[in-house]
């Protein structure tokens, strides 16, 4: 069974994810990204989708043209888990190598 992060675990784990913010009213984190164009945004989403499928852990996301908004939370645990942290770290790693627009 997947356990929801405790308040202390959450605080400690999120210190390493400065680009992610808490979602108001939910035990979830979010990040918004902008890319040069739709092709770059979709390419980024494809890389994340492949990893998410491998992890069997899928983000909630929204895409319009060059913008991608991502929310992470584990539905089975009703909140933030280590799976969300690992996927957020992977997303940050991909961002560091794809250089989204400011």
Curated annotation (Swiss-Prot):
Keywords assigned by UniProt?
A: Lyase
Task: Establish whether keyword Lyase is in the entry.
Answer: yes
Q: Which Gene3D superfamilies match?
A: Transcriptional coactivator/pterin dehydratase
Q: Which InterPro entries match?
A: PCD_sf (IPR036428), Pterin_deHydtase (IPR001533)
Q: Which reaction does it catalyse?
A: (4aS,6R)-4a-hydroxy-L-erythro-5,6,7,8-tetrahydrobiopterin = (6R)-L-erythro-6,7-dihydrobiopterin + H2O
Q: Name one GO biological process term.
A: tetrahydrobiopterin biosynthetic process
Name the EC number(s).
4.2.1.96
Record carries keyword Manganese: no
Give the molecular function GO annotations. 4-alpha-hydroxytetrahydrobiopterin dehydratase activity
- State the top-level EC class: lyase
Could you tell me the superkingdom of the organism this chain comes from?
A: Bacteria
Q: Which HAMAP family match?
A: Pterin_4_alpha
- Matching PANTHER family: PTERIN-4-ALPHA-CARBINOLAMINE DEHYDRATASE (PTHR12599:SF0)
Family the UniProt entry places it in: Belongs to the pterin-4-alpha-carbinolamine dehydratase family.
Protein known as: Putative pterin-4-alpha-carbinolamine dehydratase
